Amino acid sequence: MTAMDRLDHVSNQLAAKRQKKNPEGKPFRITVVGSGNWGSTIAKVVAENAKELPEEFHQIVKMWVFEEEVDGRKLTEIINTDHENVKYLPDVKLPDNIVAIPDIVDACADADIIIFNIPHQFLPKILAQLKGKVNPKARAISCLKGLEVTKDGCKLLSNYITEELGIYCGALSGANLAPEVARQKWSETTVAYRIPQDFRGEGKDVDQSVIRNLFHRPYFHVRVIDDVAGVSLSGALKNVIAMAAGFVEGLGWGDNAKSAVMRIGLVEMIKFAHMFFEDCQSTTFTHESAGVADIITTCAGGRNVRVGRYMAEHKVSGFEAEKVLLNGQSCQGLHTTREVYELLAAKNVIDEFPLFKATYQIIYEGLPMEKLPELLEASED
């Protein structure tokens, strides 16, 4: 028995001991909304747990897929027949209990737990289709990386989901590059989930132990905390920092420069969090995978740093780089940078966030990347 086999065996024994038995005899039904590389990866994780915990989770995990054709075949057909998302997560076998569904309402109608995992700019359209058509007792987890921003302030996407659908929503974020998680390379993540005010009782409703059982794997360790705002903001703002890290990497400035960007970015992230969400906990950013660990990982190899690097190396726009590099997927940092800048400018506090400001100016106003150190130094005078 290999070390990983032993780890699997011990993990399965522990999971069996803590498995919640629904007194109504109805395991929780799971739906994943989204089938990009991270959506497909999370579907793989929860489908594996559904198989191992049949008294707690329904054996079938539904995954909503935006239908498209790949080499003349529908993507849902490929996933359901070949058990592989050949476009967004190639060369990774998916569990056969994942069922790809092209209709969003059909995918979510009877779900007890809905996991949202789509580019955040598509969320309003998705929620409009689901409004009034989901189980009113369902719970949700947002894996989205972004904010709902207006000139008056910003809203967590988890709160936006709650307001639109009337169901409680937590958040998942961490140092999780999807290809590594999908290939079962060990990592950890943070799930923020508070017990809902209308909690119906242990075994009848989703509590923190159910959430941990749903996501925790021997290769994907889960810490469940209460700070939904902190986890959500970390997942969104780290992408802005990663864009800037990509700039300095593409310019060939080395690891010292990238570390400086990451340090300044972490400071601005915490300042932003406390400015708009007073109940955020600073330890979320410094102690959890969703905080500094996610910044490090995202700046080392995520799609946002790749886009920023390509912009610097090839002197192209962010959206050109996105098109070349991401195979139809979204670079969230491009959108979040604009949203954060517009909010801070409307509040007349943009100069308190020099890295966020400079990143916006580079992407959207053509500011030379080489001016980044000068702008950051001037802000400290």
UniProtKB/Swiss-Prot annotation:
Residues 1-27 are annotated as: Disordered. Its EC number is 1.1.1.8. It comes from Pichia angusta (Yeast). NAD(+) binds at residues 34-39, 66, 122, 178, 303, 332. The active site is at 238 (proton acceptor). It comes from the Eukaryota. This is Glycerol-3-phosphate dehydrogenase [NAD(+)]. One of its GO terms (cellular component) is cytosol. GO terms for biological process: carbohydrate metabolic process; glycerol-3-phosphate catabolic process. Keywords: NAD, Oxidoreductase. It catalyses: sn-glycerol 3-phosphate + NAD(+) = dihydroxyacetone phosphate + NADH + H(+). Substrate binds at residues 145, 303-304. PROSITE patterns: NAD_G3PDH.
